[in-house]
Amino acid sequence: MTAQNENAQAQAEQVEVANEAQLEQTAEIQQEQPVEAELAAAYARINELETYVAEADNREKDIQLRAQAEIQNIRRRAEQDVEKAHKFALEKFSKELLTVVDNLERGLNALDTAVTDEKTQALVDGVEMTHKEFISTLAKFGVEAVGVVGEAFNPEVHEAISMQPAEGIEANHISVVLQKGYTLQGRVLRPAMVMVAG
């Protein structure tokens, strides 16, 4: 029986060693599982934070680009406002000068019929030179006359007083200019008052 006891005891020891080894493996696995779970949670949190940082960077870049675009728009608008102010600063002054031009032209028309001698002709020539110089000076500052007989009617720069048939002039073209119109840098100062061929 001793050999059997020894065998039984050896088997019991082997079973006990196997049980201990199995318990150690189970303990190691149980220890590794919480570590792996914590590690997986930590990696998930890291990924989440990296995504948040990337989105924050994108938001910051977007805000910066929008701010730069807004600054450029404000700068461009300010430049346009200054340009318009320079361009049209003379508008009121130019409108007042148009009355002077009209009166000079009326005076010239009246003098043309009243010329009787050389002295009167010299006066007419002087007034004509003054008129031409005045028109030239206005043109230097962007004031241009509009409304010529035979020109196509344009409601943006012409004001039609009436329509009537006219020989040698196409329909919807100016037949008579009652008062010249003027523009300043392309903007209408005063529309031309005209009669249109019908």
Curated annotation (Swiss-Prot):
GO terms for biological process, alphabetical: protein folding
PROSITE patterns noted in UniProt: GRPE (PS01071)
SUPFAM superfamilies associated with the record: Coiled-coil domain of nucleotide exchange factor GrpE, Head domain of nucleotide exchange factor GrpE
Entry-linked CDD domains: GrpE
Role according to the record: Participates actively in the response to hyperosmotic and heat shock by preventing the aggregation of stress-denatured proteins, in association with DnaK and GrpE. It is the nucleotide exchange factor for DnaK and may function as a thermosensor. Unfolded proteins bind initially to DnaJ; upon interaction with the DnaJ-bound protein, DnaK hydrolyzes its bound ATP, resulting in the formation of a stable complex. GrpE releases ADP from DnaK; ATP binding to DnaK triggers the release of the substrate protein, thus completing the reaction cycle.
Protein name (database record): Protein GrpE
One GO CC term, this protein: cytosol
Family assignment from sequence similarity: Belongs to the GrpE family.
Protein's UniProt keywords contain Lipoprotein: no
A Pfam short name: GrpE
